[in-house]
Amino acid sequence: MLTAHHLDVARRHDTILRDLSLSIEPGRVTALLGRNGAGKSTLLKTFAGELTGSVAPHGVRVTGDVTLNGEPLARIDAPRLACLRAVLPQAAQPAFPFSVDEIVLLGRYPHARRSGARHVIAHRDRDIAWRALERAGADALVGRDVTTLSGGELARVQFARVLAQLWPDHDATESGPRYLLLDEPTAALDLAHQHRLLDTVRAVAREWQLGVLAIVHDPNLAARHADTIAMLADGTIVAHGAPRDVMTPAHIAQCYGFAVKMVETGDGTPPVMVPA
């Protein structure tokens, strides 16, 4: 598991996360909900290993324990960590005119054979990149300059990149559960692509036994696709569990400061949240 235990994160004089404990389980999708500024991205970055060690931003203090498969996250070097977890950040706009293929192949660099100072991308890696593009519904974009893509098209390409990074590979040097961290993966997508992406996330979590943490702004979308929902408010988890148990008017009011009512759909899926 990927676990935070009694986690505190502060930036200068501001406490962002306080005494927070949360585990991301292999084979399951955890959706993280919370209002703007609640600390969701900070928690995801902590799980990603971006706030500790030499990469920690100036003025950020992290206390508590974060472990990946039982090993302290801070002790895992960057090459190993890149084989064990992939991160899709909010803003992933390339500054240079790479092709779609090149962006997705970046996901294979942690696994590539080294020849001196160079990484050698094998035919197997190119095949995995192509299959990842297909799985992400972005194969029609192959060959395009990424600077010409729409926001939604680029989001699907970047999703393919993280799929390629974690794609099951019998020649992989690292074994054990792996983890996918997604920061608002559906923000740039239309309605159909939002559901397709999260359907794919849930499918690969099952098939590859990935532990997934996804920040999602639409509680209804999260409830439909996640196995577990964690609600963040005032720097800590205020509700955690199955969508049907967590998605209540009281929890939504505590998390968002907004009154809602729940409407049953009658099809066995969690109730839908609407304004009260």
From Swiss-Prot:
What membrane topology does the annotation report for this chain?
Peripheral membrane protein
The EC number(s) given in the record are 7.6.2.-
Coiled-coil stretches are none
Top EC class per UniProt?
Answer: translocase
Q: Which Pfam families match?
A: ABC_tran
Xref: InterPro entries: AAA+_ATPase (IPR003593), ABC_transporter-like_ATP-bd (IPR003439), ABC_transporter-like_CS (IPR017871), P-loop_NTPase (IPR027417)
Q: Where is the ABC transporter domain?
A: 2-259
Gene Ontology CC annotation, any one: plasma membrane
- Keywords assigned by UniProt? ATP-binding, Cell inner membrane, Cell membrane, Membrane, Nucleotide-binding, Translocase, Transport
The family annotation for this protein states: Belongs to the ABC transporter superfamily. Heme (hemin) importer (TC 3.A.1.14.5) family.
UniProt-listed NCBIfam families: PRK13547.1 (NF010067), PRK13548.1 (NF010068)
Q: What is this protein called?
A: Hemin import ATP-binding protein HmuV
